[in-house]
Amino acid sequence: MGSVSSRGHRAEAQVVMMGLDSAGKTTLLYRLKGYQLVETLPTVGFNVEPLEEPGHVSLTLWDVGGQSQLRASWKDHLEGTDILVYVLDSTDEARLPEAVAELREVLDDPSVASVPLLVLANKQEVPQALSLPEIRDRLGLQGFLGRSWDLRACSALTGAGLPEALESLRSLLKSCSLCMAR
């Protein structure tokens, strides 16, 4: 992978999306690309898609499989990451402790020590979905000192919250002084 760089007038950034299986990472990836709903299968390995953003930013989105047997390889995808996106299934309260533990393990990796984090609380269209304050409390996001982060509600199914998620992604990228200095 690479880092934020400027080739000509276009900045490039590597965005890695992680989260437990069935959180909706692949559906989010293709919705961000502008596709309507697509049928997805569990990701074995990863999916990679470019996303041209207004403002001369070219994003490469890496959607890394979240099945338990694939998580050991997550660290292989962290080197050169400019923004880490962690996708949560807001309706799966039973697996939230597992999701939190996996997120903390990723964030402990030295290669992403200063990398900004965007947490996407997916499946917010479901009435029983956890609220953002509930998710914030359970993740302990306030404890991420020294790291730029944001938490956004979204729905890969309806597309709700995705424009705001992209705006947050852009803001985090701009705030990343280490990224911009590369």
UniProtKB/Swiss-Prot annotation:
Alphabetized SMART domains for the sequence: ARF (SM00177), SAR (SM00178)
Covalent lipid adducts (N-myristoyl glycine), residues: 2
Superkingdom of source: Eukaryota
Coiled coil: none
Gene Ontology terms describing biological process: intracellular protein transport; vesicle-mediated transport
InterPro entries assigned to the protein according to its UniProt record, in alphabetical order: P-loop_NTPase (IPR027417), Small_GTP-bd (IPR005225), Small_GTPase_ARF (IPR024156), Small_GTPase_ARF/SAR (IPR006689)
GO CC annotation terms, alphabetical: cytoplasm; plasma membrane
Pfam families linked: Arf (PF00025)
UniProt keyword list: GTP-binding, Lipoprotein, Myristate, Nucleotide-binding
GO MF term (any one): GTPase activity
UniProt keyword Metal-binding present: no
Binding site for GTP: 19-26, 63-67, 122-125
NCBIfam families reported for this sequence: small_GTP
Function noted in UniProt: May play a role in apoptosis. May act as a tumor suppressor.
Entry similarity comment: Belongs to the small GTPase superfamily. Arf family.
Name of the protein in its database record: ADP-ribosylation factor-like protein 11
Organism: Bos taurus
Organismal lineage: Eukaryota, Metazoa, Chordata, Craniata, Vertebrata
